[in-house]
């Protein structure tokens, strides 16, 4: 068997997305909360960003980075019984891309797609697989950038967010928790302002968040409970994971009040808690194909 550890922040939407995937599919893992300032829990690794997943099997430990890549690799591992994670990593090559800021960075261009060696699956190009990958990309490329400007919109909201998450986490009642709460809220309040400018958001950043949530529910449509049909697929889990970081905060209450997302959100939450995501085996693809035939 494998031992999986997830190193994460309570307040990070990429981390909640990864955690929701593991929970949705009943994958056992150890959840390790990293202090957002000191990060001593990650001193074993040269990589200092979260989420970070370590996979230990037969004495070998592999590090998986990037939330969407983690999800795709673990999903692909489950549906490819004869392939190990090291082999799968080779199927997700990194390439150098230049961002809008002119800076070069390493990116995995196919990270929103699953790998399969079976000929019938490898050649299938159907609307459901494409739709899932496109909305996973949307969650990473657009939706996630609306979270910090909304959660940390004012200093009061920033403090509310850190106060709540510190109380929920393992740093509650410690001096590390106090540092995280006060320094973290001040830092993120400032970062939220810069992100609003960087991503050219409306002066009232809530409006962009409302539009995004309604766009998502419109894409699902009235004929489906989830984008995955009767069960959440990886797009559902990704969008839910990003939004769930706002739970119990003012921004979350406003979203439920001003958009149509409430019904989908709580059905997805229940499915994740019940390990009710689409089964990651060959039946998974049968379900996808059946929706387009």
List each model region and its residues.
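Alpha-helical recognition domains of nuclear gene-regulatory proteins
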Residues: 21, 73, 212-215, 219, ...
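Acidic carboxylate-rich catalytic motifs and surrounding loops in phosphoryl-/glycosyl-chemistry enzymes
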Residues: 33-34, 230-232, 281-284
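GST-like domain detector, emphasizing the conserved glutathione-binding G-site
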Residues: 1-172
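GST-like fold's C-terminal all-alpha helical module
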Residues: 100-260
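Long, positively charged, glycine-interspersed low-complexity recognition regions
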Residues: 235, 239-293
């Amino acid at each position: 068997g494998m031992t999986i550890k997830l190193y994460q922040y309570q307040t990070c939407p990429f981390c909640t997305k990864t955690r929701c995937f593991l929970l949705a599919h009943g994958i056992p893992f150890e959840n390790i909360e990293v202090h957002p300032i000191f990060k001593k829990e990650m001193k074993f690794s040269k990589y200092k960003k979260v989420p970070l997943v370590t996979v230990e099997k037969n004495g070998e430990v592999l590090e998986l980075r990037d939330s969407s890549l983690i999800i795709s690799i673990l999903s692909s591992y489950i549906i490819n019984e004869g392939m190990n994670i090291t082999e799968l990593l080779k199927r997700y090559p990194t390439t150098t891309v230049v961002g809008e800021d002119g800076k070069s960075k390493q990116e995995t261009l196919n990270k929103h797609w699953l790998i399969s060696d079976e000929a019938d699956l490898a050649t299938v190009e159907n609307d459901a697989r494409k739709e899932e990958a496109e909305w996973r990309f949307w969650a990473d490329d657009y939706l996630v950038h609306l979270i910090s400007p909304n959660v940390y919109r004012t200093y009061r909201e920033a403090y509310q967010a850190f106060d709540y998450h510190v109380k929920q986490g393992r740093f509650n009642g410690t001096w590390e928790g106090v540092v995280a709460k006060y320094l973290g809220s001040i830092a993120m309040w400032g970062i939220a302002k810069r992100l609003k400018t960087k991503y050219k958001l409306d002066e009232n950043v809530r409006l962009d968040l409302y539009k995004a949530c309604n766009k998502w529910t419109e894409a699902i449509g009235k004929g489906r409970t989830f984008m995955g049909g009767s069960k959440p697929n990886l797009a559902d889990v990704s969008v839910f994971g990003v939004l769930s970081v706002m739970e119990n905060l003012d921004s979350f209450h406003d979203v439920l009040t001003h958009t149509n997302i409430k019904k989908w959100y709580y059905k997805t939450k229940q499915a994740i808690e019940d390990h009710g995501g689409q089964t990651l085996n060959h039946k998974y693809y049968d379900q996808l194909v059946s929706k387009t035939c």
